[in-house]
Amino acid sequence: MDKPVLKDSLRLLSSLGKITSRSMFGGFGIFIDDTMFALVVQDKLHLRASDETINLFKEQGFEPYVYKKRGFPVVTKYFAISPECWDEPDSILIQAVVALDVAKKDKEKQKSAGPSRIKDLPNLRLATERMLKKAGITTVEELKNTGSVNAYKAIQQTHSSSVSDELLWSLEGAIKGMHWSVISAETRNELRKQL
């Protein structure tokens, strides 16, 4: 299938960095260095808007991309540029630079904010969050302050059935922001000794 808008967009935006595209939202997300800042869907290039640029996009007559999720419309932060913009590719590039900057800043904010709930940490699920809550640990900050060993001990004390060593590795990985399987054997032995 020929996708001229996608090809033209990738060609135009490639000067911004290492460009890739992935299928998403019924179209293709456009990424520079793993940061999505544009979307090609319904044969239109959409650029990511920020709180500052959203009004500018609306003034220019750009429409947000809307898709349905469970039957309800979801309005995205991606606005379709008008076909006339293709007559001035430099103006698209200028807006794309702003869109990329916005996307990078949003990505950094998300990274630094971190998960707000325990279940959103690596390795942990809702069941683990409930076990920790029963043990008196209700927030991500409390878990980090308690530490994996003490959190594991608290779960052992409040749980009638036995809990596996894997839970200890999962807690340690969650606190460190990594998958439990990459925790070294040395660290696992140190943690086991503290039990």
Swiss-Prot record:
Q: What happens when the gene is disrupted?
A: Defective in DNA transformation.
UniProtKB keywords: Competence
One Gene Ontology term of the biological-process aspect is: establishment of competence for transformation
Which Cys-Cys disulphide bridges does the record give? none
UniProt record similarity statement: Belongs to the Sxy/TfoX family.
Describe the function of this protein: Required for efficient DNA transformation jointly with TfoX1.
Q: What is this protein called?
A: DNA transformation protein TfoY
- Please report the organism this UniProt entry assigns to the protein: Aliivibrio fischeri (strain ATCC 700601 / ES114) (Vibrio fischeri)
